[in-house]
């Protein structure tokens, strides 16, 4: 499975694959993928890392675990593949993006153009059993993704960490706040979006920090159509 990381994330994460924790996780996943329906497909597990190399990361949007419906998850937080209905949380993200920067919502949920500009779409847990949210929590993914957050936090070039919801905000403890910038609010889920997500302006705040630190801002406007995977 570790062979699925094919860029400069590998030397960053390699020590995690040499731990007893990872061996336990590996054994758990072999059993789960062998006997259960698990998302995403195995070759997509590390998609977030492959889409956004370590040296290119400017922003991290931290999710909790993958979508657990058929065909939704493909290894990147909040994103879904072309042709899949836009999930409610992502619909709310689009609403806030329009209110914040005037970007009209698109009809797909494929966030690759963000990733290619340096937005790491990272979930804390990288797999899930079909129909069972949070079912793979506590089996070892958190140690690996925490290590990724810590490594980014220590990089010379500062990073923006976007933390939506209690689980993501708990990761603030891993981040060097003197060097980096945290944008945090309620989760965009319909259950909580009106409790502080709407009106939080995460996209403009992110770009202001990037420009202040000499980095190019993110073009948050997604293409209206998607013609590549």
UniProtKB/Swiss-Prot annotation:
The active site is at residue 65. GO terms for molecular function: uracil DNA N-glycosylase activity. Transmembrane segments: none annotated. CDD domains: UDG-F1-like. Keywords: Cytoplasm, DNA damage, DNA repair, Hydrolase. It is an enzyme of class 3 (hydrolase). Its EC number is 3.2.2.27. The keyword Phosphoprotein does not apply. Disulfide bonds: none annotated. It is found in: Cytoplasm. InterPro entries: UDG_fam1, Ura-DNA_Glyclase_AS, Uracil-DNA_glycosylase-like, Uracil-DNA_glycosylase-like_sf. Pfam families: UDG. Gene3D superfamilies: Uracil-DNA glycosylase-like domain. It catalyses: Hydrolyzes single-stranded DNA or mismatched double-stranded DNA and polynucleotides, releasing free uracil. GO terms for biological process: base-excision repair, AP site formation via deaminated base removal. It comes from the Bacteria. PANTHER family: URACIL-DNA GLYCOSYLASE (PTHR11264:SF0). Excises uracil residues from the DNA which can arise as a result of misincorporation of dUMP residues by DNA polymerase or due to deamination of cytosine. HAMAP family: UDG. NCBIfam families: PRK05254.1-1, PRK05254.1-2, PRK05254.1-4, PRK05254.1-5, ung. Belongs to the uracil-DNA glycosylase (UDG) superfamily. UNG family. This is Uracil-DNA glycosylase. It comes from Limosilactobacillus fermentum (strain NBRC 3956 / LMG 18251). The gene is ung.
């Amino acid at each position: 499975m570790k062979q699925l990381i094919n860029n400069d994330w590998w030397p960053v994460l390699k020590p995690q694959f040499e731990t007893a924790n990872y061996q336990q996780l590996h054994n758990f996943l072999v059993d789960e993928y062998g006997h259960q329906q698990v998302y995403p497909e195995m070759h997509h597990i590390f998609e977030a890392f492959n889409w956004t190399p370590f040296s290119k990361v400017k922003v991290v949007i931290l999710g909790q675990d993958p979508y657990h419906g058929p065909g939704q998850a493909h290894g990147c937080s909040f994103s879904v593949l072309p042709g899949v209905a836009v999930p409610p949380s992502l619909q709310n993200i689009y609403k806030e993006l329009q209110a914040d920067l005037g970007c009209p919502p698109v009809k797909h949920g494929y966030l690759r153009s963000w990733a290619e500009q340096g937005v790491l779409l990272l979930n804390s847990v990288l797999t899930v059993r079909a129909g069972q949210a949070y079912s793979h929590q506590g089996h070892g993914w958190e140690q690996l993704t925490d290590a990724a957050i810590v490594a980014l936090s220590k990089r010379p070039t500062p990073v923006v960490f976007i933390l939506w919801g209690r689980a993501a905000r708990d990761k603030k403890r891993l981040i060097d706040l003197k060097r980096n910038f945290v944008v945090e609010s309620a989760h965009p889920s319909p259950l909580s979006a009106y409790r502080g997500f709407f009106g939080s302006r995460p996209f403009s705040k992110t770009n202001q920090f990037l420009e202040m630190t000499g980095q190019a801002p993110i073009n948050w406007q997604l293409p209206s159509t998607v013609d590549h995977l």
